[in-house]
């Protein structure tokens, strides 16, 4: 599967030194995240994968450990962790988090602040941008409860990727397909690119009071101290 990206080649180094967390939940689409993890690693990102226990029924954690070079995190109380509060430690490193595929169950947990496994506790501790890619049966996706939960996540700053429509693993046809890995990668690249919107640009900042002439004698002015301009500069 060859990924084709919308950003120019010279901008691919934007992931160098960046940490991406991938949250994988129980869905048949979980196998696609192996392609995404591999693509991120090739672009020099530091990639950490967190899985729910249900996700391990669809893809083995060893797959992600091989592709990323990092331990795949599943169990909150794993005895092999280094001495640190692991979910907080990983959360602090993250520049962006993507939950894909995101099941109805995990979407509901995140929307209502339920943190009962490694994935949800880590996401609750993250202050970076969070992207959610729902993947489920059409009837589940269109369920008003799921839609309300997605709206709640958007209210709290999550970006929700609308699922594609097509033939689903259950045999139905409709909305609920997770987008292909290359599209998910583009979402991550665009998010990281926002940090560098002004990179290499020259910006002129003016500070202090201004004067606008009414006629040769009178003018309108203000009492601005210029402190805000100095802070911005």
Protein language model regions, located:
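A cross-family phosphate/adenosyl-ligand binding-site feature
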Residues: 2-131, 137-226, 230-233
């Amino acid at each position: 599967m060859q990924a084709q990206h919308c950003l120019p080649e010279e901008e691919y180094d934007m992931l160098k030194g960046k940490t991406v967390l991938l949250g994988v939940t129980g869905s048949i689409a979980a196998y696609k995240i192996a392609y995404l993890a591999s693509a991120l690693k090739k672009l020099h990102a530091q990639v950490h994968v967190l899985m729910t226990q249900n996700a391990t029924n669809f893809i083995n954690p060893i797959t992600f450990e091989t592709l990323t070079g990092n331990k795949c995190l599943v169990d909150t109380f794993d005895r092999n962790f280094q001495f640190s509060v692991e979910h907080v430690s990983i959360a602090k490193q993250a520049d962006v988090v993507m939950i894909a595929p995101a099941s109805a169950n995990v979407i509901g947990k995140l929307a209502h602040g339920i943190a009962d496994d490694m994935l949800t506790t880590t996401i609750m501790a993250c202050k970076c941008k969070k992207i959610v890619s729902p993947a489920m049966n059409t009837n589940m996706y269109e369920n008003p409860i799921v839609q309300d939960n997605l709206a709640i996540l958007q209210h709290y700053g999550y970006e929700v990727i609308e699922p594609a429509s097509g033939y689903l693993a259950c045999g139905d046809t409709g909305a609920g397909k997770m987008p292909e890995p290359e599209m998910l990668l583009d979402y991550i690249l665009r998010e990281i690119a926002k940090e560098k919107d002004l990179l290499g640009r020259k910006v002129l900042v003016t500070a202090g009071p201004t004067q606008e002439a009414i006629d040769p004698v009178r003018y309108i002015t203000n009492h601005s101290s210029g402190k805000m301009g100095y802070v911005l500069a």
